[in-house]
Amino acid sequence: MSTMLIAVILLTLLALFFGVLLGFAALKFKVEGNPIVDELEAILPQTQCGQCGYPGCRPYAEAIANGDKVNKCPPGGTATMEKLANLMGVEPEPLNAEAQSQVKKVAYIREDECIGCTKCIQACPVDAIIGAGKLMHTVLTADCTGCDLCVEPCPVDCIDMIPVGQNLKNWNWRLNAIPVTLIQETPHEEKRG
């Protein structure tokens, strides 16, 4: 046999041995996760924004499982908070007062200063920044959660967080709709006389 064939066979056997060893170690030393944390994390919006005071959705889910409040997720809103409260069996509370009092902000890239490094795109957890390498980037304001994670990695500091004012484009018309009460028609009684 040639030395090349011996080397290939030897490497294949070595890879097979270590593969079996790793498979055994994975089964023997398997760490069971907390299933309630997995369920809580599935409910959270996965923006990894840190507005709750934790570095991501998984740590916040672990904190909720350990008894922290369920009302600290501004991107998730009231619907997420109610689902979390239902799962944990606690009373729903209004969203965190700090989160509600803050004006919603979105990222704004000063495109004339942008060098197209793509670091902000990589940092954005919701893909709200579009652009390509060596070209200017821009933010899709409808998708931006205002998490502020894109500001720090920018090497030329061309990203600002600006407050979003209400205008015709972002006004929630259904929220401020005029209440309408439907009246059921009743058969009229015939006039006598």
UniProtKB/Swiss-Prot annotation:
Residues 1-26 are annotated as: Hydrophobic. [4Fe-4S] cluster 3 binds at residues 124, 144, 147, 150. It comes from the Bacteria. Residues 105-134, 136-164 form the 4Fe-4S ferredoxin-type domain. It is an enzyme of class 7 (translocase). GO terms for biological process: electron transport chain. GO terms for cellular component: plasma membrane. It is found in: Cell inner membrane. Binds 3 [4Fe-4S] clusters. Disulfide bonds: none annotated. Its cofactor is [4Fe-4S] cluster. It holds the Pfam family Fer4_21. Coiled coil: none annotated. Residues 32-90 form the 4Fe-4S domain. [4Fe-4S] cluster 2 binds at residues 114, 117, 120, 154. Its EC number is 7.-.-.-. Keywords: 4Fe-4S, Cell inner membrane, Cell membrane, Electron transport, Iron, Iron-sulfur, Membrane, Metal-binding, Repeat, Translocase, Transport. GO terms for molecular function: 4 iron, 4 sulfur cluster binding; electron transfer activity; metal ion binding. PROSITE patterns: 4FE4S, 4FE4S_FER_1, 4FE4S_FER_2. NCBIfam families: PRK05113.1, rnfB. The complex is composed of six subunits: RnfA, RnfB, RnfC, RnfD, RnfE and RnfG. Belongs to the 4Fe4S bacterial-type ferredoxin family. RnfB subfamily. Part of a membrane-bound complex that couples electron transfer with translocation of ions across the membrane. This is Ion-translocating oxidoreductase complex subunit B. It comes from Shewanella sp. (strain ANA-3).
